[in-house]
Amino acid sequence: SVSKAPVMFVMGNHDKPYDAETYNGCICIEDQIRTFRGIRILGLGGSMRYHPDAANQYTEKEMRRRIGRLRWKLKRNKGFDILVSHAPAAGIHDLEDLPHRGFACFCELIETYQPKLFVHGHVHANYGTGFQRVDQVGETMVVNAYDHYILEFPEG
């Protein structure tokens, strides 16, 4: 990476578990809150479960449980500034089919903590729907980072 910032990521629905060497210096923030330059970043990878035995796929109930296990981290960090997920939130950039449906519990996270930014992927521009890249939900800018999306933050 040519960036001076760390490269952080979450797992997608087709990703397999890797060993630390495979990350090649990148940081998996799955189920963590990482702080960089005072910015608190929460990571929740995976998608809605559409295949019974697949890794990184979750029912709504399973994703809620993951978030519930983070409650002490959320409290200790006084919330978060950026949510990074693979899947979208329900009703925001998602599709009606089960594999591309968003999580309602992400909407609740946004409503409760009002992060400045929610970055997700999973819904590709070439799916033929009315692809929406950026939305605003209350105080939260929602970005579908499919393929790539460049966000610049001021120094400091």
Task: Write out the residue ranges for each language-model feature.
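Active-site environment of divalent metal-dependent phosphoester hydrolases
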Residues: V10-A20, R49-D53, A89-H93, K116-D135, ...
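Binuclear metal-dependent phosphoesterase catalytic core
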Residues: R34-G38, Y58, C107-Y113, L117, ...
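Core catalytic region of metal-dependent phosphoesterases/phosphodiesterases
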Residues: S1-F36, E111-T112, E139, V143-H148
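Conserved catalytic scaffold of divalent metal-dependent phosphoesterases
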Residues: N13-C105
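Divalent metal-coordination and catalytic microenvironments
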Residues: G12, I41, L83, F118, ...
